[in-house]
Amino acid sequence: MSTAIATTTLEELQSAESRLLVQTYGRYPVELAHGEGVYLYDSEGKRYLDLLSGIGVSALGYGHPAITKAITQQAETLIHTSNLFYHRGTTEIALRLTEITGLDRVFLCNSGTEAWEAALKLARAHAGLLRSEGKQIGTKFLALEHSFHGRSIGSVSTTHKTAYREPFGPVMPGVEFIPHNDIAALRAAFSNDVCAIAIEVLQGEGGINWISEEFLVAARELCDSTGALLLLDEIQSGMGRTGTWCAYQHFPVMPDVTTLAKPLAGGIPMGAMVCTEEAARAFKPGMHGTTFGGNPFACAVAIAVIDTIKHEGLLEHVTETGTYFIEQFNALKHKHDAIAEVRGTGLMIGVDFHSADVAKHIHETMMKRGFLFNRTHDTVLRFLPPFILTRDQIDIAIRAMDEILTTLTPPVASNPSGEKVHG
């Protein structure tokens, strides 16, 4: 008896999936079949310029020779051992992660959610260690409005959106949400009851919102005053997406703990929690663990990803290409009143529209034309393209969006006084 799914059309595949899978995602009506460089191809051969990279995962695009080589060689050698034995890959990737983050120790896992869950557990364990040493510190977390940290019961507790938390209530207690970049609210909420402040340096799901330097400095100072930990979530913004290895490296602030995932292993599931020596002393053998985390296969690919980003100068390329992309989006904003704001740095960009309906229309029409990105926070189009994106490819996307916007509203030009006038 065959177990193959007999489907020949997208509609048949959709029907089969609706019967067989737990329905946790609303998918776009596209069946992707293969990829090459920055392009994806659907089952009918249509080509798409990928400006989302699997929600920030495929930073080196598709079929990169360094990644293909690492996958092939390691698959032929050793895929899994468990964490009961040594293998060289864990030390090699940990060395690279401590170098690029400026931190001291690494916990390897399988996803961003797992990395964040480890960070939360570490913060609670560290507070317990401090209490055993006679210090006064509690178990409360301060998180930010519009934050997204994952979907496990701990990480979703520090995720702000009510729709993500309510179905699973009561979630983990002891979390208070602070308005984004509101230093007065942060100071008012902070006390010896707090074991950690949790921050996305550049919010992704929340609409591409930077933390301010002043807020981050204040958070660091408050944590230093009591021994609480500063947790910086770099799952989406890290690994070079903003032109630095971590987005916090744009500021004069170091975290106690940071979390990395998404592009870390080029599409192979992997996450990492990286922390200071002080924070790490709270974990002892047996307190936390993972069966698959840090396996030889994922480590080999992650090593190849980091080395390729270095050797190909992709941090500089992301900075230059991202600056150009943002400049072109701002030119569209100047021309079309539909765009409210352009936000982001490097290749983590949000284009915010005044109208959710317009944002939805642009997104759907661009997809039909062969461009992949997504819409978040209703009005924001989110762009997380592969790091190898070129200016020519950006120009193609900008022209397409300009054409669609022009059909919606008359373009806007500047008169000699600098004021906008409709043409």
Residues of each region from the PLM?
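Conserved N-terminal phosphate-binding loop of PLP-dependent enzymes in the Aspartate aminotransferase
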Residues: 2-423
